[in-house]
Amino acid sequence: MLPSHKQTIAQLLSDAVGSLLPEGQARPEIVLERPKQAAHGDIACNVALQLAKPLGTNPRELAGKIADAIRADARGQRLVAAVEIAGPGFINLRLSAAARADVIAAVFAEGDRYGAANTHDGAPVLVEFVSANPTGPLHVGHGRQAALGDALASLLDWQGHKVHREFYYNDAGVQIHNLAVSVQARARGYKPGDANWPEAAYNGDYIADIAADYLAGKTVRASDGEPVTGERDVENIEAIRRFAVTYLRNEQDIDLQAFGVKFDRYYLESSLYTEGKVQQTVDALVAAGKTYEQEGALWLRTTDDGDDKDRVMRKSDGAYTYFVPDVAYHTTKWGRGFTQVINVQGSDHHGTIARVRAGLQGLNIGIPKGYPDYVLHKMVTVMKDGAEVKISKRAGSYVTVRDLIEWSNGDAESEAGVDTIRACVEAGEPNWPARFTRGRDAVRFFLLSRKADTEFVFDVDLALKQSDENPVYYVQYAHARICSVFERAGVDAASLTSADLAAVTGPDVSPQATALVQRLAAFPDMLADAARELAPHAVAFYLRDLAGDFHAFYNADRVLVDDEAVKRARLALLAATRQVLRNGLAVIGVSAPQKM
């Protein structure tokens, strides 16, 4: 039901209850639910069951009095067609034709912003996601983070937040050193398996590509940084490191472009060291008495804040453990005014949550407990040609986001092993990401089609199917099908705002029409719930249900009939459905094609 209807009906019930309560007794909270069975109406409320015992009244009798008050109220007469008492005292309400017509009118009036709310009035929120090490291509786990994080950020924007998308580059530490020595080994002519190949080196073909470009003196640049030119000197490990990191950051930028994700800021872990923020954080924790030394190491008293044991901050060799810069990084988030922060990360980060939060609490700078929030996702398995894919030639040990986008795009060149995204970039093809819309849409939708905390199997063969089995095709086809109906009808949707909607909202309409209107009405509340619960998968679930309701209605009620009033009413319902499909797809970054 529309949020405005929900508010009115809740107030209506509250007023009805208030009229029956003894003077001075507080009114209970009114909770509205959707009945499990459509035959029981549109709204259910158990307030009579709650109040019967305190009032010493039979719950059915009390429910009957509440129902009489609703029927006598002008608000109830407009929005409620029937009030029924069920079981021991449940109050079931059926919405009126006017209430259903309001849904379609609201979609027409609000258009591309139907479902949006200004609940949070511009309150800032930072969503950190992807945050990959610049040591290799983005893998499918990063892809799941990109889909989840970008959709979540969009959801929060739709609820009135001022959203900041941030990517944290782990460009410090031993993994970056391993990257540099890997490229150096390739530049010297070694390859995996050779006696001189470093033990901790990366083996993917991309390492050879970086080495070749470094030796060729090519220039690379990340989207937010200065250009770096290969110095050709195989002995200069720092120059190799700088070139390799920038090269891979640029590669990740390309993958994110193909995926349709834009960040407001890329934050470098290395800057926390160069700007002294890590040392400042450690010094502050020491000064606060939150640390102690043991066996040459510096420990943080994380057990004070719920961790199962204290944690090492600085090892005996002087190196900081990985959660220390994380604590420093989060102090910058708080210092920049982000009182709400959400980190989207793999489930392997679960163990760091208590440590980061304990470190932030130890600083005693006003950060609330439970800061930041986390959305953790489980792993993704990739299936192709009926078998699990474990190794990518490009990456060496895992399937990349680029692999998924190219495979799901259905290009013959990609099937033949050509890096088509790289080819488009090198050819300077204008607006090249548009060429990969099909693959991007499939990857985004699929990676949102399960809850984040469940493991997911990405079936490339299914992503390429043009059938109802393919969830993104099923939803997009609903949108395209409606566009086709309007093309055949030769009717401008804007002309339907004044249509008589009785044929789709009246008492004698098909159950399919009623179900479709109910689904449209649920869109704003679904978005609000998904944002509050940090659950972007709910949008994908809703879109599949909406597409199903549309297809059921379309198959049950012929739209282009001779009766002009009926035709216009059904076209108006289709126009509203198309708008909500488009809005929902926009929230999760998936296109709404007019033809398929």
From Swiss-Prot:
GO terms for molecular function: arginine-tRNA ligase activity; ATP binding. A motif ('HIGH' region) lies at residues 132-142. One of its GO terms (cellular component) is cytoplasm. It is an enzyme of class 6 (ligase). Keywords: Aminoacyl-tRNA synthetase, ATP-binding, Cytoplasm, Ligase, Nucleotide-binding, Protein biosynthesis. Gene3D superfamilies: Arginyl tRNA synthetase N-terminal domain (3.30.1360.70), HUPs (3.40.50.620), Isoleucyl-tRNA Synthetase, Domain 1 (1.10.730.10). It is found in: Cytoplasm. SUPFAM superfamilies: Anticodon-binding domain of a subclass of class I aminoacyl-tRNA synthetases (SSF47323), Arginyl-tRNA synthetase (ArgRS), N-terminal 'additional' domain (SSF55190), Nucleotidylyl transferase (SSF52374). Its EC number is 6.1.1.19. It catalyses: tRNA(Arg) + L-arginine + ATP = L-arginyl-tRNA(Arg) + AMP + diphosphate. GO terms for biological process: arginyl-tRNA aminoacylation. The keyword Acyltransferase does not apply. Its main location: cytoplasm. Belongs to the class-I aminoacyl-tRNA synthetase family. Monomer. PANTHER family: ARGININE--TRNA LIGASE, CYTOPLASMIC (PTHR11956:SF5), ARGINYL-TRNA SYNTHETASE (PTHR11956). This is Arginine--tRNA ligase. It comes from Ralstonia pickettii (strain 12J). The gene is argS.
